[in-house]
């Protein structure tokens, strides 16, 4: 039986560019902080392990196993603290023909099991020169209901959130690195996708010289449940009540009136 109420946290952090070791330490520390607050699910920003500025040449120089220890420790933390974890990270996939990099989000449950690995589908501008695009939108069934994942620019198209909604998503997490000059779109996109699909959306952003912060959780009617500052690192926490979805959908019949 799924839990109708649960506590989530968005870890709005400053990411140290290209410093995997320090970023991982910060991620583990935030997980421990969240556990002390009895958080059920914690989400981190996009590319939280390495940042956004790494070049194609620098990617190629990374060792093949640079993620292995990090993911193993994430699984250990999830199991030890009994917490679900979503982290945006740099994924490396090597085949006989090539080595590809993805802008991904790993989702680990409170038993340390990897539930999903979502890859960013829509790549923003020069990201196309560094990363390979994903090809599906992920929704996973959990003890907290059905959880969807989108990464940053995926949110700027109406189809991804609608696809996840039609797959049954009740809350969508959006790990992001959202810039200052697009802050107005951040607020609009989160609210609009939430309202049009009548579900919760949790957007987790970073804070630094280019990211606007303002991590926020949006309710099924598009209203803001809670919002972080634009400059400070913080653990933004709130209780999600899934009953609000049915309440809002009873008042706003978008999905029942949707022409299939």
Region locations from a protein language model:
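Extreme N-terminal starter segment of soluble prokaryotic enzymes
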Residues: 3-10
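Short, glycine-anchored, charge-dense loop/turn motifs used at functional sites
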Residues: 8, 107-115, 218-226
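Short polar catalytic/cofactor-binding loops
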Residues: 12-17
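Cys-nucleophile CN-hydrolase/nitrilase-fold catalytic domain and related Cys-dependent amidase chemistry
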Residues: 20-21, 28-109, 179-195
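Short beta->alpha transition motifs characteristic of CBS
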Residues: 56, 106, 118-124, 216, ...
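CN hydrolase (nitrilase-like) catalytic-core segments centered on the catalytic cysteine
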Residues: 66-86, 155-234
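Active-site catalytic loop in hydrolytic enzyme cores
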Residues: 96-167, 180-182, 188, 192, ...
């Amino acid at each position: 039986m799924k839990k109708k109420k649960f506590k989530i946290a968005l870890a709005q952090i400053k990411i140290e560019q290209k410093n995997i070791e320090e970023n991982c330490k910060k991620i583990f520390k935030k997980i421990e902080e969240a556990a002390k607050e009895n958080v059920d699910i914690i989400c981190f920003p996009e590319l939280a392990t390495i940042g956004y500025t790494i070049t194609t040449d620098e990617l190629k120089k990374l060792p093949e196993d640079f993620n292995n220890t990090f993911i193993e420790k994430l699984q250990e933390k999830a199991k030890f603290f009994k917490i679900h974890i979503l982290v945006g990270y740099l994924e490396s996939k090597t085949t006989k023909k090539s080595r590809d990099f993805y802008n991904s989000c790993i989702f680990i449950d409170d038993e340390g099991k990897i539930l999903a690995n979502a890859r960013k589908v829509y790549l923003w501008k020069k990201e196309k020169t560094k990363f390979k695009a994903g090809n599906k939108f992920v929704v996973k069934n959990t003890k907290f209901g059905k959880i969807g994942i989108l990464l940053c620019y995926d949110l700027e198209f109406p189809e991804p959130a609608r696809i996840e909604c039609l797959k049954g998503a009740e809350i969508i997490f959006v790990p992001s690195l959202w810039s200052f000059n697009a802050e107005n779109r951040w607020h609009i996109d989160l609210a609009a996708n939430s309202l049009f699909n009548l579900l919760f959306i949790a957007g987790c952003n970073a804070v630094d010289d280019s990211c606007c912060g303002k991590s926020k959780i949006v309710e099924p009617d598009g209203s803001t449940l809670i919002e972080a500052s634009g400059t400070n690192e913080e653990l933004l926490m709130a209780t999600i009540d899934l009953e609000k979805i049915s309440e809002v959908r009873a008042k706003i019949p978008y999905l029942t009136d949707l022409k299939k």
